[in-house]
């Protein structure tokens, strides 16, 4: 076997979780509002605008970022007053959560702040679709994750490997919790890693493939940490990946299905997403590499008979492109896929009209992916940028 090329790097960031910074920002904004009221001014919030018009790809940092366009929300404005009130309500709720060391889900945050305004028939919130955007506004205003404000989403994803995790007063090794590993919580800001005995992290799209690798002893034999995203990576998983790379120096290798959905999962982990452009510097990991599945794998490993047809209408047919074909053409225009390696893969997918799943490797044998496919590609540096 060739000499391993994957090894830990020098950390670029330090563990920096500090609830006090959120409390400080809340206090500063609240004091400014109070001062405006005392001075007879119209209180306002300046909030970075959401939407495509305020999003760009930064070539230097290789991240999808938010621009500098702002929208101003006034108290003494009929069109703004309701959202202004809702913003202050959520700010007060966040202060209480952080001060008391408690966490709440998005749904709990909605219900906790929903009530009828005294003397009226008006509710503060009618639906969670009103409270969620306010929380996103605060993220953009403060430049922090909602998880740092102690507001969480449902947990999804798990890790397995020789890494010691400290979660509050608990400390445990993620390779000694059974084959199910450690479920990644919605909030990972407070998690610390006293001991890491792996060379790199392998991010795996499907739980079935992650389970296969664990059963075949891949993490122990290859000295790797398995991170199962279970589909599109959650915010908690993306933040964990970012922290493991920048704070602990772990190289990140991504393993997904060879289809437009899998490639988008990789894109989101690597460059961030348009919807969360304001958090790319906390969630994205531009140094990530892609091991597969690729179109080249189909012929190299004799998988022609286990491919699946792309869904939709090809661009050269009436009514096309639609479905997978349309998505691939969109991905070909992503700035971060504007290199010959990725253009080749996407063009081959269009030309052949096929997709290839991770589980297709079982056609060779159940252990093939763990004992041949991944070790060969990773140790040979056969990775896409």
Swiss-Prot record:
EC number(s) recorded for this UniProt protein: 5.6.2.2
Sample GO molecular function, one term: magnesium ion binding
UniProt catalytic activity: ATP-dependent breakage, passage and rejoining of double-stranded DNA
CC cofactor: Mg(2+)
Keyword vocabulary terms for this entry: ATP-binding, DNA-binding, Isomerase, Magnesium, Metal-binding, Nucleotide-binding, Topoisomerase
Coiled coil spans: none
Residue intervals of the Topo IIA-type catalytic domain: 17-158
Species for this entry: Thermococcus kodakarensis (strain ATCC BAA-918 / JCM 12380 / KOD1) (Pyrococcus kodakaraensis (strain KOD1))
Known role: Relaxes both positive and negative superturns and exhibits a strong decatenase activity.
Primary enzyme class: isomerase
One cellular-component annotation, GO: chromosome
HAMAP family with a match to the protein in the record: Top6A (MF_00132)
InterPro entries: Spo11/TopoVI_A, Spo11/TopoVI_A_N, Spo11/TopoVI_A_sf, TopoVI_A, TOPRIM_Topo6A/Spo11, WH-like_DNA-bd_sf
Subunit structure: Homodimer. Heterotetramer of two Top6A and two Top6B chains.
Annotated protein name in UniProt: Type 2 DNA topoisomerase 6 subunit A
UniProt binding sites for Mg(2+): 205, 257
């Amino acid at each position: 076997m060739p000499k391993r090329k994957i090894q830990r790097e020098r950390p670029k960031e330090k563990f920096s979780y500090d609830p006090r910074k959120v409390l400080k920002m809340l206090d500063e904004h609240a004091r400014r509002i109070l001062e405006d009221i005392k001075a007879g001014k119209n209180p306002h919030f300046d909030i970075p605008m959401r939407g495509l018009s305020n999003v760009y790809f930064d070539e230097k940092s290789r991240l999808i970022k938010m621009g500098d366009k702002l929208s101003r929300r006034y108290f003494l404005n009929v069109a703004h007053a309701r959202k202004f009130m809702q913003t202050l309500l959520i700010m007060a709720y966040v202060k209480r959560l952080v001060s008391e060391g408690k966490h709440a889900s998005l749904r709990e945050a909605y219900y906790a702040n929903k009530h009828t305004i005294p003397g009226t028939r008006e509710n503060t919130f009618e639906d969670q679709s009103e409270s969620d955007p306010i929380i996103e506004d605060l993220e953009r205003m403060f430049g922090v994750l909602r998880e740092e404000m102690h507001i969480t989403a449902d947990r999804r994803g798990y890790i397995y490997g020789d890494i010691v995790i400290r979660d509050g007063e608990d400390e445990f090794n993620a390779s000694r919790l059974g084959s199910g590993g450690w479920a990644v919580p919605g909030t990972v800001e407070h998690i610390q890693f006293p001991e890491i005995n792996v060379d790199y992290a392998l991010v795996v799209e499907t739980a079935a493939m992650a389970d296969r690798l664990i059963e075949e002893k891949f993490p122990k034999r290859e000295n790797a940490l398995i991170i199962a995203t279970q589909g599109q990576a959650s915010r908690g998983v993306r933040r964990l990946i970012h922290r493991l790379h920048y704070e602990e120096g772990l190289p990140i290798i991504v393993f997904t299905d060879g289809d437009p959905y899998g490639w988008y999962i990789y894109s989101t982990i690597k460059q961030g997403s348009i919807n969360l452009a304001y958090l790319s510097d906390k969630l994205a990991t531009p140094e990530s590499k892609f091991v597969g599945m690729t179109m080249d794998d189909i012929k190299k490993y004799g998988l022609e008979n286990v491919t699946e047809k792309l869904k939709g209408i090809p661009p050269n047919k009436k009514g096309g492109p639609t479905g997978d074909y349309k998505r691939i053409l969109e991905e070909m225009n992503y700035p971060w896929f504007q290199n010959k390696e990725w253009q080749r893969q996407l063009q081959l997918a269009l030309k052949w009209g096929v997709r290839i799943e991770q589980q297709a490797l079982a056609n060779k044998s159940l252990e093939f992916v763990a004992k041949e496919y991944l070790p060969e590609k990773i140790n040979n540096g056969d990775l896409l940028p």
